[in-house]
Amino acid sequence: MSNLYESIRKYKCGYIEEILNILDMFDPLLNKFQRNSCYEDMKSELSLFMFNLIDNFPLEKDCFKEDKFIINYIYKALKNKFIQVNKLHQKIKSCESNIDIVALNNCDYSNLLSFVIFEDIIKDLTQNEKNIIRKIYLDRLRESEISRELNISRQAVNKTHLRALEKLKKLIN
């Protein structure tokens, strides 16, 4: 591996072809992240991230005069981006599967969009709160019906419902 510090410095001075050398140095790492991800565009996503990372690289810091610190910095940044992209991809897949479930129930587009927005709004509630909110607003059940179904008191359902609404109010504001 040639001097990474010099390659980054040359790239920042205008030698555009140096970015290709830097990407080649980290190609095995990018391939590893690609293999470990179920997201098919992970390598290109991380390559684009590397362009931004190198553009904003803090070469003026003294600790980045040695390659080992630069390599570690880039590795950690790529790993964090890998985790972030994977989480986002999983979230998108989850929403897509929810959309598929709703679509199977013969809902029209506006109901589908409303459902996705509704699920996004209640994502920060506890499972019990989500369950009660869904039953009240999606299934249109009364609190007494929910209490019989869940074998809890109507007051407990009401209390959980009000607590969930307060949480949602705080999240929105």
UniProtKB/Swiss-Prot annotation:
Gene3D superfamilies: 1.20.140.160. NCBIfam families: sigma70-ECF. This is RNA polymerase sigma factor TcsR. Keywords: DNA-binding, Sigma factor, Transcription, Transcription regulation. Residues 122-169 are annotated as: Sigma-70 factor domain-4. The keyword Transcription regulation applies. Belongs to the sigma-70 factor family. SUPFAM superfamilies: Sigma3 and sigma4 domains of RNA polymerase sigma factors. It holds the Pfam family Sigma70_r4. The keyword Lipid metabolism does not apply.
